[in-house]
Amino acid sequence: MPSISMMSDAITPETLKKEKKMKSETLDSDDTVVKKEKSSSKKKEKSSSSGKKDKEEKEKKKKRKAVDLDDSSDKSDNSSELVQADDLKPKKAKVMEEAVVEAEDPNSLSNFRISKPLKDVLISKGIKALFPIQAMTFDNVIDGCDLVGRARTGQGKTLAFVLPIVESLVNGRTKDLRRSGHGRLPSVLVLLPTRELATQVLADFQVYGGAVGLTACSVYGGAPFHSQISSLTRGVDIVVGTPGRVKDLLEKGVLKLGSLLFRVLDEADEMLKMGFVDDVELILGKVDHVSKVQTLLFSATLPSWVKQISTRFLKSAKKTVDLVSDQKMKASISVRHIVIPCSASARPDLIPDIIRCYGSGGRSIIFTETKESASQLAGLLTGARPLHGDIQQTQREVTLKGFRTGKFMTLVATNVAARGLDINDVQLIIQCEPPRDVEDYIHRSGRTGRAGNTGVAVMLYDPKRSSVTKIERESGVKFEHLSAPQPVDVAKAVGIEAAAAILQISDSVIPAFKDAAEELLSTSGLSAVDILSKALAKAAGYSDIKERSLLTGMEGYVTLLLDAGRPFYGQSFAYTVLKRFLPATKADSIMGVALTADKSGAVFDVPVDDLETFLVGAENAAGVNLDVVKALPPLEEKVQISRRFGGGGRGGRGGGYGGRGGGYGGGGYGGGGGYGGRGGGYGRR
């Protein structure tokens, strides 16, 4: 089958710039003709000196895209000359500068057929220029072309169809075709994979469509039928929904597509992954007058099913706008990608420190692989809320609203939110383990660094079961390999914040605490600096600071590197070497053994209390070096195999991470499921 780009006119950023440049040159040419005509009439009424001045002013007008700088109150009775640039007020000069900047940006709103009401809404939201995917698709949609649009996640694909569809319905070619009045059939149908995404796309249609008198509703499972049926019965212009509920409403005869002008498939690749293939094909096939319907397909990736859909249901003259193409880099380039080794049991203690180090005080989303682990982890983290498919839709909407408004700053979610969330100011993404599919990593990490912002994506991984290299290779990202934040480093950062907070306290408290402070200073035997350090620690919530493993992130452990002067071909060799100079019980107590990438040694964790025993023992062993690791060396990765999920699925009968016969096998991530202890996935065996 030929590729989409071969069957249609592919559009690139370079061709768009050329078109914009040609349009700009044409406008300049037209302006010159008009200006010459005006200049001719003026010359008949002016002296030679004023004619010279008019000629100079005409050149300045041309450079400024004919921005009208006249001020009628400043004109003389017998002159129509423009005010000279030297006489401009600062306010006018600023307007002139902004106009020049706007003219230089090919994606400026002024370069597109956007009506004033919509332009006003965009400007009110701080949008003065379209994103590349929006700019490159706008004219095609307005002109009635079927279209396939592909861009990296977080690059504004939603507005790429919302804006031109709304403009077309009220001012464009479909204006006279759109139905009106009570009970009208919808003109637009948007299909997408999740309820969360439906809610957000609806919100965009309500903002932009509402500004020009259009109405919209969303239909999805988990919400009552009667309210959705009521909306459709009253009549709407735009319907946004998930395939399952749209199919149900079509079969009930409540949703009718007889007046459809636009059909949109948003996140088409995700609908494939979620098993909506049959439903999507059935819905698309329900449209009879296909020649009158414009079809738009947007996707971050183009798997074979998406290509087949575009061939079957889009017109042969369709356009393709591909901002990814064959580029290797598919993950967001505005995101800092970090990987940190961490065992499952260490996550609840480590994640808060990761948020402190990389969250910058903003919103954070934590992704887990199961619903159970999302709920359990949210319960262990202060100020966090879970979001997954088992939560009632009304509660999910309340949760999302609270997250957007800053009522709480940490969301723990399953993949249900990976494509559905479109919140521009998420600062940090944490993935508790490498996802099974590389595309999942791309979409999860793409929840930050959106709409021109930057962000951080941290992925935790077990060094013994890692697919980091595979994700790095296939997504095109370059991971920063970092160790778990050490409690002492986190405490230093928190201490700076606590010190700044102390300076904000009113001096009125000093008399009340001064006597106690002086007594403490005179009797404690500590210096003033030491006492103040302890006070800052208390204010920051610290009573002590523990060591943390660089290998697994577990508190109370330290990571060692073993070098025996010969290659390590298996983990068992590390135990053999250790038993030469340590009691068997001590050797067997080590945790998280992993070989270095060059097989020259092995790293593992030991309890802090046993550190001295290990180091002294190694000093008395010939040909053995044992050192405390300051930074992890590159480690050997082991490919994960599909049967790792055992007979119990992702957690087996025990649930969570691990489980009897499931999870990572026999409680590999701990016991019988859940978080902690013998019954918890985040507990040790």
Swiss-Prot record:
Write down any Gene Ontology CC term.
Answer: nucleolus
Q: List all Basic and acidic residues biased stretches.
A: 22-42, 66-78
Cell compartment(s), UniProt: Nucleus
Q: Where is this motif: Q motif?
A: 107-135
Q: Does the keyword Protein biosynthesis apply?
A: no
* Gene3D superfamilies membership: 3.30.70.2280, P-loop containing nucleotide triphosphate hydrolases
Q: Where does ATP bind?
A: 151-158
Which superkingdom does the taxonomy of this entry point to?
Eukaryota
EC identifiers of the protein:
3.6.4.13
Task: Tell me the GO molecular function terms.
Answer: ATP binding; ATP hydrolysis activity; mRNA binding; RNA helicase activity
Tell me the ranges covered by the Helicase C-terminal domain, including all copies: 349-491
* Reaction catalyzed: ATP + H2O = ADP + phosphate + H(+)
Q: Where is this motif: DEAD box?
A: 266-269
* Helicase ATP-binding domain location: 138-320
* UniProt family annotation: Belongs to the DEAD box helicase family. DDX21/DDX50 subfamily.
Annotated domain remarks:
The Q motif is unique to and characteristic of the DEAD box family of RNA helicases and controls ATP binding and hydrolysis.
The name on file for this protein is DEAD-box ATP-dependent RNA helicase 7
List the top taxonomic levels of the source. Eukaryota, Viridiplantae, Streptophyta, Embryophyta, Tracheophyta
